[in-house]
């Protein structure tokens, strides 16, 4: 069986965009690897007390991601180690730790390490516009393409790379 590696920006993106693909791949016996750029620290809070949850939102969303990975049959989940950039035009966009401000070569290098380790048959990430323009989704697309370009120059590429809408 093969390996499917997906690159997402935040916890919950895996469910919203590719949950069905991930579960089916797992059910068919494929290895499923999820790379998440951030811990979703700037996400929206719908069903919890914002004042008490906001300071620990990254922890909350990391736990939600862990549970999601269990349900979807993810074999390995790794973070790239960046901070959620928030929506375009927000103050969080200016945080130097935010994903969308990360140097492309640095972030692509981090992803390339995981790609080298896994040698996936299929890689999935966002369209160039990040599906709806979120700065971290756009960055995830560019980082994935740059990492794949880097590895192709080293003589390797996955059998297929897909962009999800």
Predicted regions and their residues:
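Active-site rim/loop-helix segments in enzyme catalytic domains that contact anionic ligands
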Residues: 1-118, 145-146
């Amino acid at each position: 069986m093969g390996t499917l590696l997906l690159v997402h920006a935040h916890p919950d993106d895996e469910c919203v965009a590719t949950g069905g693909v991930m579960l089916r791949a797992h059910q068919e016996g494929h290895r499923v690897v999820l790379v998440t750029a951030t811990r979703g620290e700037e996400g929206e809070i719908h069903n919890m007390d914002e004042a008490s949850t906001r300071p620990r939102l990254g922890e909350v969303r990391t736990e939600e991601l862990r549970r999601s990975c269990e349900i979807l049959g993810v074999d390995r989940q790794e973070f790239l180690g960046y901070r959620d950039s928030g929506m375009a035009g927000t103050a969080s966009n200016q945080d130097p730790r935010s994903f969308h401000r990360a140097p492309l070569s640095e972030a692509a290098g981090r992803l390339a390490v995981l790609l080298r380790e896994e040698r996936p048959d299929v890689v999935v990430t966002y369209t160039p516009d990040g599906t709806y323009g979120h700065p971290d989704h756009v960055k995830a697309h560019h980082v994935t393409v740059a990492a794949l370009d880097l590895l192709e120059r080293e003589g390797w590429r996955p059998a297929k790379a897909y962009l999800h809408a």
